[in-house]
Amino acid sequence: MNRIIRSSIISVLLVLTTNIITAQSKVFDNLKMESKILKMERKFAVYLPPDYETSSRSYPVLYLLHGLGDDQTGWIQYGEVKKIADNSIKNGDATPMIIVMPDANTGRVGYFNIPSQRWMYEDFFFEELMPYVESKYRIKSGKRFRAISGLSMGGGGTLTYALHRPDLFSAAAPLSAGTGSTDVEESLERIKRYGIEFTREEMKNLLENNHPLNLIKKMKLSDINSIRWYIDCGDDDYLFEDNSLLHIAFSKKGIKHEYRVRDGAHNWTYWRESLPLVLEFVSKGFHQF
């Protein structure tokens, strides 16, 4: 009898151990797809939650955008997305989700369309990248199960994409968002520091079509408020003023949003601390209230 019991216990332990070993998250940081819109190959990275390979269910998705000078590996290498997402899911603060990190390291202002330069990155994102990853991976369809976040330049992209397509995102969480000025001359001077050249007309069109302060003036309040907003910037960040003005503009417009200012600057230490809060915030939208 003891031998039978011992054998049964060992069998159960083996099954449990196997499940623990197999139920691990995975990150793929060098995935590729061909873009007809951009006429080039583009890279992206994906985080798959721990139970992805042991289940058959579909998952919500977070699009996570990097900043200027980084690529699709930034959030993996410096942002420690795997470790942070694993811990948030394990602790029950975040629901299991797929995280998609595109590469916008293109030598241009990454996330925007620039028609005069025949550069249509935003079209690529919505018309090629999103349909590709959402068909390749088991991602739940619909606005309710889709969120977007990003840091610095990616924070600016987060704002613009969510405002351009409020029908697609349930939540948007810009971190230390690089919004810049709405003034054309000031914006031209600012962007020269990064070695990027624009004509005055190009900058004028870019600001009119993409700057969040300009976009919210044209939009219906109901469309903007169909998105849950989380704005976060450190008190020592050089973009603190821009983000504060964004918060004020949102408040004056009547846009419901969370605004967080914590101790910190424009660096990965701050964004690593922000990511668990973002995962928790978007997860609340993925669940039913």
PLM feature spans:
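Bacterial Sec-dependent N-terminal signal peptides
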Residues: 1-26
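Non-catalytic cap/lid and distal C-terminal segments of serine-dependent acyl enzymes
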Residues: 24-289
